[in-house]
Design a protein with these regions (language model features):
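Solvent-exposed loop/turn segments at secondary-structure junctions
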Residues: 28-33, 59-62, 98-101, 115-118
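Catalytic-core regions of hydrolytic enzymes
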Residues: 1-41
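Active-site-adjacent mobile loop/cap segments within catalytic or ligand-binding domains
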Residues: 90-142
Length: 142
């Protein structure tokens, strides 16, 4: 499946570039009502930006992923940075039982950038805000 192909790519890049510290897996979420109508999730501080969500994999499904809490700490640090200027940009962090290939580094994040109901412009604006917050978090050593 898609995650097996993604895993092969991650392994290849980590082997070729062993200094890689962070792996970002970017998605658009599918949030819809019972009739299949897609929800459009927007940041309250910037109506032109979609909301974001971190999905953190764990070892809850039985597969080895002992350091998953390191990824959770990173997600929380980035979310805290973003919260200062954009309190409604981030949806709550979700921890799931699957690994989502996050066992490959302790700097792995799955980022849901808006939903299928958001426009491309809203997703790009949110991604720019995320990138600035991610960089600021790293610069501050959090």
């Amino acid at each position: 499946g898609a995650y097996n192909r993604s895993l092969a790519s991650i392994e290849s890049y980590l082997q070729k570039y062993p200094s890689i510290s962070f792996v970002l897996d970017v998605h658009r979420d599918a949030v819809q009502d019972a009739n299949g109508q897609q929800f459009k999730l927007l940041c309250g501080e910037d109506k032109n930006a979609a909301q974001l969500e971190f999905v953190i994999g764990s070892n809850g499904g039985g597969l080895s992923h002992d350091l998953w809490r390191e990824n959770l700490k990173l997600a929380c640090a980035v979310q805290e940075t973003l919260y200062k200027d954009y309190p409604t940009l981030m949806r709550p962090v979700t921890v799931r039982n699957s690994r989502y290939n996050q066992h490959m580094t302790t700097g792995s994040l799955l980022v849901e950038v808006g939903t299928a109901g958001n426009s491309l412009e809203e997703a790009i604006n949110a991604a720019r805000i995320f990138a600035a917050g991610f960089a600021k978090t790293l610069q501050n050593g959090e």
